[in-house]
Curated annotation (Swiss-Prot):
The modification Phosphohistidine is found at residue 390. InterPro entries: Bact_2-comp_sensor_kinase, GAF, GAF-like_dom_sf, HATPase_C_sf, Sig_transdc_His_kin_internal, Sig_transdc_His_kinase_LytS_TM. The keyword Acetylation does not apply. Changing residue 390 to A: Complete loss of autophosphorylation. It comes from Staphylococcus aureus (strain NCTC 8325 / PS 47). It comes from the Bacteria. This is Sensor histidine kinase/phosphatase LytS. Disruption phenotype: Deletion significantly reduces target tissue survival during calcium-daptomycin treatment and increases susceptibility to host defense cationic antimicrobial peptides. Gene3D superfamilies: 1.10.1760.20, 3.30.450.40, Histidine kinase-like ATPase, C-terminal domain. The gene is lytS. Coiled coil: none annotated. It catalyses: ATP + protein L-histidine = ADP + protein N-phospho-L-histidine. Member of the two-component regulatory system LytR/LytS that regulates genes involved in autolysis, programmed cell death, biofilm formation and cell wall metabolism. Also participates in sensing and responding to host defense cationic antimicrobial peptides (CAMPs). Functions as a sensor protein kinase which is autophosphorylated at a histidine residue and transfers its phosphate group to the conserved aspartic acid residue in the regulatory domain of LytR. In turn, LytR binds to the upstream promoter regions of target genes including lrgA and lrgB, to positively regulate their expression. It is found in: Cell membrane.
Amino acid sequence: MLSLTMLLLERVGLIIILAYVLMNIPYFKNLMNRRRTWKARWQLCIIFSLFALMSNLTGIVIDHQHSLSGSVYFRLDDDVSLANTRVLTIGVAGLVGGPFVGLFVGVISGIFRVYMGGADAQVYLISSIFIGIIAGYFGLQAQRRKRYPSIAKSAMIGIVMEMIQMLSILTFSHDKAYAVDLISLIALPMIIVNSVGTAIFMSIIISTLKQEEQMKAVQTHDVLQLMNQTLPYFKEGLNRESAQQIAMIIKNLMKVSAVAITSKNEILSHVGAGSDHHIPTNEILTSLSKDVLKSGKLKEVHTKEEIGCSHPNCPLRAAIVIPLEMHGSIVGTLKMYFTNPNDLTFVERQLAEGLANIFSSQIELGEAETQSKLLKDAEIKSLQAQVSPHFFFNSINTISALVRINSEKARELLLELSYFFRANLQGSKQHTITLDKELSQVRAYLSLEQARYPGRFNININVEDKYRDVLVPPFLIQILVENAIKHAFTNRKQGNDIDVSVIKETATHVRIIVQDNGQGISKDKMHLLGETSVESESGTGSALENLNLRLKGLFGKSAALQFESTSSGTTFWCVLPYERQEEE
């Protein structure tokens, strides 16, 4: 009996080793998580059928004299029996996959056992079917609770399965005396070994999946913590101050040697090893970062040469570089460095891939929030500066004066005032409008201003029809025209010209120009215009600052507001993508 127990333990050990290997394969772990799908069930049927066949082939042959022999057997003599781990594999198949998998594996295992032959081989087909169904029932109960049977319960089920096996031998064997003799020899070893094996097999499955869940929970906690701490800085956009704070947070929360963040052209921050030469404000040093900016794909390297830093004493030996995107365009990179290449593992790569998507989304959310605030600010500025009570009452007084002199002109101005109010309210709720709508709003505004000051301004709008559906930010031209009216001409009563034009810049971009022949802008204010508020007698200059921020936020730095100014006039322009409104 002791010899049989030791031989069975060897077979169970082989099964357990294979189970451990399988549970460390990501595909198999994923299969266990999908075990209730039919595709997964069929795959489990195949896997556990192979286990069952191996259990049959590696069984221990027992003859009438209780002699034991262990090898690989395909066929057995008619007067011998076989002790094996078949019940273990069928039982685990049912506990994992439910009744269908348990029955399928039981039938396959039983048919193969009949094919092998031996004394009363048909008994084992019957017992295998019973074991598969009963184990599957317990497995189904656990599946409904979205769990696996506990280790203790698995051991108890293993004992029950072996007892069913022994009862089947006693019930269906032709030679009852031989059946009793066989059971007295194999019952205790097989019950002990196979029940323990079942418990160990299930413990490997449960512990591996639980470990993975715990790892995911830790990663999720870390990622959420990163998100919560970095989101306020991502809202500010990618600048040196925000990038420095983000890099410090990532360095503190993750096991990395250094963290760096770059824009498309320069290092914004570098925290940790190598900070003596990876200095913010410098141009990007590593060829690795340049490759990621060019390809837009995450890259992982494990040597100093692959990093591509030209500094001879750079301690960085491995890195993973994540592209940061906004609206599909690469705006920078996040780099995590390691001084020991072995610290860059599969887990770090998975985490980095997840962070790439999260950080890019945070940048977009931050930009969207910024744009929303800017648009809201533009609405407020527009209503304050252009639709103020002063402007409104002046327009009404002008219209009232015209009623007696030229009622038709008064009616037209009243319609223009109505359109102007409506256009301001609608434009404040949109990120972009067509150039045609923007020009209509400008004309409405100019009609009211020219009615108040007849002959003071000459407005020339030179825009080809093909450009009228180009998308522009609301208030773009209106703000520039109003700026010219308020600031360019001071007290000059006539000869004041404002030209609005749109020309082709490239095959994909257009240039929008607003030009006046006013007195120009003083040199002490030129470098501030569009970058910050500029105080003057008639305003703060914040409208131009707001407009410039919206242009850069929507279309990138290349769309920034530009200007030239001399004593004979000022020209404002911006270059925008030739994006047209889709036809409905």
